[in-house]
């Protein structure tokens, strides 16, 4: 019998393929996104030192994990990054399609001043 892989397994494989090409540096750290059913988590990571420079999630902001919450999260993480002097990042969509909540987060981060 042929076993169908779950969508999360295929997303994880897609994310590994993306991570081969998306690398954060001290000049342009990586903006990583993880999306669950209940929350969205964002980290800005320097991959050379393996340090998380800043992070945010929808649970801390007390907003939902919907498109409006993703936009608020994008704005919040961009403000945190600008306080640290980070203006340019590399966007890592985490294997998710660039659509819906992921797109709303990215658009809000760009509007708040991050460049990617």
Curated annotation (Swiss-Prot):
Keyword tags: Ribonucleoprotein, Ribosomal protein, RNA-binding, rRNA-binding
Gene assigned in the entry: rplR
Gene Ontology molecular function terms on file: 5S rRNA binding; structural constituent of ribosome
Signal peptide coordinates: none
Family indicated by similarity: Belongs to the universal ribosomal protein uL18 family.
Gene3D superfamilies named in the record: 3.30.420.100
Gene Ontology CC terms: cytoplasm; ribonucleoprotein complex; ribosome
HAMAP family: Ribosomal_uL18_B
Record's protein name: Large ribosomal subunit protein uL18
Subunit structure: Part of the 50S ribosomal subunit; part of the 5S rRNA/L5/L18/L25 subcomplex. Contacts the 5S and 23S rRNAs.
GO biological process, one term: translation
Function of the protein: This is one of the proteins that bind and probably mediate the attachment of the 5S RNA into the large ribosomal subunit, where it forms part of the central protuberance.
Lineage: Bacteria, Bacillati, Mycoplasmatota, Mollicutes, Acholeplasmatales
Species this chain originates from: Acholeplasma laidlawii (strain PG-8A)
